[in-house]
Amino acid sequence: MSLFTPLSETNVRSHTNTSSVFCRRIKTLVAGLTALGLMLAAVSASAGFYVSGKQLREGNGNNFIMRGVNLPHAWFPDRTNQALADISATGANSVRVVLSNGRLWSRTPESQVASIISQAKARQLITVLEVHDTTGYGEQTAATLSEAVDYWIAIRNALIGQEDYVIINIGNEPFGNGQSASTWLNLHRDAINRLRNAGFTHTLMVDAANWGQDWENIMRNNASSLFNSDPRRNVIFSVHMYEVYPNDTAVNNYMSAFNSMNLPLVVGEFAANHFGSYVDAGSIMARAQQYGFGYLGWSWSGNSSNLSALDVVTNFNAGSLTTWGNLLINNTNGIRNTSRKATIFGGSGSSSSSAGSCGTAPNGYPYCCNASSATGNGWGWENNRSCVVATTSTSCNWYGTSYPICVNTSSGWGWENNRSCIAASTCAAQ
């Protein structure tokens, strides 16, 4: 018996047709997988804000350091659109917006939230949204964190898809004094899990205990545990610095702890005065710049008469800066001198003395901050990537903060390319 069966013409045609169909199916499958891969690549290239170590990053991987102002929308909704334009004009890259879930004030409807986000985007501002009704829960009548989550889920259509532009601050100062660490931790953990299960992939911001000031260090001591409990590891921590932080020692002790833990911190509220007590706002801004942490000054305007010193401008008039507003915006470490617009708006991205950014060369690579041309051909290696060694100095390390060298100013300080710069001679003389 023959070991091989000869192929008839019919068998050959059948085999050929089967092979042809098989090949077409393979090609279709490959094309489908390729298209899926391209879609996934597009999504991953711009998947919203995320946390890497102590840094908040845009979807494209650029660091984003908040420099902005709080805006009391829930109490003055008719002022919001103009205020957003005025806040953006200060150079701010972000705005924290007061909303209400209806527990204490008029509920902010989903349509208003969508409009706020749209207006902020038009002004190149990243929006931090917060429910203010949770303020001081446990020590005064207030909404619970669970009620705040109910609100976020109810307005989810305004939020889903805005992950590149919106950060959700779950609840403002959601615990007063006298609350246990386990209460702060467990209720925040529950809130985060509910939001994740509801489809929210946004960066979530959580406020400290003790009316946000964390004088018992409840948030500081439990931040790592809460961060690791989030399945997305996409949480940033917000402390409100008022009279508990009257000097640089208090400010630095708190910020350096988060820096050592490699966890992201934002000063979600602060001012230079609180109910007549001094707050070391200068140190808050300087230390935030040193460590690469964000800050958001309280608040644009509209504070009650006993807190009018906390207004950045008088009566929502952008041309009338208060003493506090001038400090927040024009200080060496203030908004105008340190803010960088988000790159999703075409900005250059954020930098600080710790972020290691000294500008971008024409070829798209960063300029080296410290490397020499030891590797040859004008290239260096910093922050685990190649950098361009400038042929002439382009930046100055001014007492721990990096500033660009002015092109047209021969001495002192100048203003070029919409930011402060320092003359080479002044830098050399420090």
Swiss-Prot record:
InterPro entries to which the protein is assigned, alphabetical: CBM10 (IPR009031), CBM10/Dockerin_dom (IPR002883), CBM10_sf (IPR036601), Glyco_hydro_5 (IPR001547), Glyco_hydro_5_CS (IPR018087), Glycoside_hydrolase_SF (IPR017853)
Domain CBM10: 357-390, 395-424
EC number: 3.2.1.78
Keyword rRNA processing assigned: no
Source domain of life: Bacteria
Disulfide bridges in this chain: none
Assigned protein family: Belongs to the glycosyl hydrolase 5 (cellulase A) family.
Role, per record: Catalyzes the endo hydrolysis of beta-1,4-linked mannan, galactomannan and glucomannan. It is able to hydrolyze mannosidic linkages that are flanked by mannose or glucose.
Record protein name field: Mannan endo-1,4-beta-mannosidase
Organism, scientific name: Cellvibrio japonicus (strain Ueda107) (Pseudomonas fluorescens subsp. cellulosa)
Lineage: Bacteria, Pseudomonadati, Pseudomonadota, Gammaproteobacteria, Cellvibrionales
Encoding gene per record: man5A
